[in-house]
């Protein structure tokens, strides 16, 4: 592999990182996902949880309020990092495809609207598999292709894939699918006030294997 070429392409992707900022829509949806999918898992309060692509910390806030303290948010956005740290969260500035986290140490990775930002999702998923403990869980939420807002063309979106492709990648990376679902929401075009649907894929995955 030509490492210098890789660095060049990788730096292009890094240059397109953007701040999530405050979003009431994403905040309310994150709360719903936590209540409907994460809390029923009944993870022990000492569970080590990573929020990859943590944004301004909506998930971290909910988990902290529920009594979880072993939480780390991952982001490359300096603004989002600052917001999260102001709320008392531990945040690490790193690429979520190359985690400075020990092997088999994490109990849950929460990857809501982050995996579509990876130029190489198979590599990213292999990295998640590496850091997850045997039998540990990965939550993935991603936009669907060819939706009204055409997420394929958003800045820093590289992997807006169909359901079957995601399922194939999960299997290849060593994950067992526990939940394979979707959620459709009604959004409003702020310019025209027209309503339109938007669908996201929801997956809860479990690590297969012991190392």
Per-range role (PLM):
Residues 111-114:
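A short beta-strand submotif of the Rossmann-like class I SAM-dependent methyltransferase core
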Residues 175-186:
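Conserved S-adenosyl-L-methionine
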Residues 150-165:
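Acceptor-substrate binding/catalytic loop of class I
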Residues 140-142:
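Acidic carboxylate diad motif detector
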Residues 119-123, 150:
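Short N-terminal helix/helix-N-cap motif within the alpha/beta-hydrolase-1
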Residues 1-99, 108, 125, 165, ...:
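Conserved N-terminal segment of class I S-adenosyl-L-methionine
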Residues 122-137:
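A short glycine-rich, Lys/Arg-flanked "PGG" loop and its adjoining helix->strand segment in the class I
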Residues 186-211:
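Core SAM-dependent methyltransferase catalytic element
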């Amino acid at each position: 592999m030509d490492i210098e070429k890789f660095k060049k392409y990788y730096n292009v992707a890094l240059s397109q990182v953007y701040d999530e900022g405050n979003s009431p829509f994403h905040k309310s949806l994150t709360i719903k996902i936590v209540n409907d999918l994460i809390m029923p898992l009944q993870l022990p309060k000492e569970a080590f949880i990573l929020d990859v692509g943590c944004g301004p910390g909506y998930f971290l806030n909910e988990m902290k309020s529920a009594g979880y303290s072993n939480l780390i948010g991952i982001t490359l956005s300096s603004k989002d990092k600052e917001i999260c740290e102001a709320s008392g969260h531990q945040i690490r500035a790193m690429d979520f495809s190359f985690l400075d986290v020990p092997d088999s140490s994490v109990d849950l990775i929460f990857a809501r609207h982050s995996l579509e930002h990876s130029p190489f999702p198979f590599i990213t998923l292999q990295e998640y598999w590496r850091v997850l403990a045997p039998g540990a869980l990965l939550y993935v939420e991603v936009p669907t292709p060819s939706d009204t807002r055409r997420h394929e063309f958003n800045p820093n979106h590289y992997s807006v894939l169909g359901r079957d492709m995601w399922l194939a990648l999960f299997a290849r990376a060593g994950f067992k699918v526990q939940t394979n679902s979707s959620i459709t929401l009604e959004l409003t075009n702020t310019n025209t006030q027209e309503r339109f649907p938007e669908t996201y894929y929801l997956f809860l995955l479990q690590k297969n294997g012991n190392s």
